[in-house]
Amino acid sequence: MSVMNGDIKERVKNAKRIVVKVGTSTLTYANGNLNLGLLNKLVWVLSDLRNQERDVVLVTSGAIGVGSKKLDFKTRPKETREKQAAAAVGQAELMHIYQNFFSEYSQKTAQILLTKDDFKEGERKTNTNNTFETLLEYGVIPIVNA
């Protein structure tokens, strides 16, 4: 987690809705193992924001990296079928870990899997927006795969 400058810190302090993006390099050590200590700190901070009745959305990547480690791939997969297999295994693992950590702080979470088509004008975009708004209305922290 990085240090924020004063302007950003002030905007976050007053924000009703906060979206946090964490990437693979934040989630894992150089050897590919998950940084569970950092993940727990992140979840603690987001849970505390939620306890302040702020809307929180977590955007996370890392599914391919986590899945590759779990499948004992020696290098990052290059073929689509291997990437998809690693992503499927890794996404399930990440959600399991996030749900366990968030439940320690009595937070509700939901997994949101999106494609670029979900943001195009029309019914899909409306449904996507409605899903987010409904989850946030019920105090759920959406976890979005990036």
Task: Locate each region found by the language model.
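Nucleotide/pyrophosphate-binding catalytic subdomain
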Residues: M1-A146
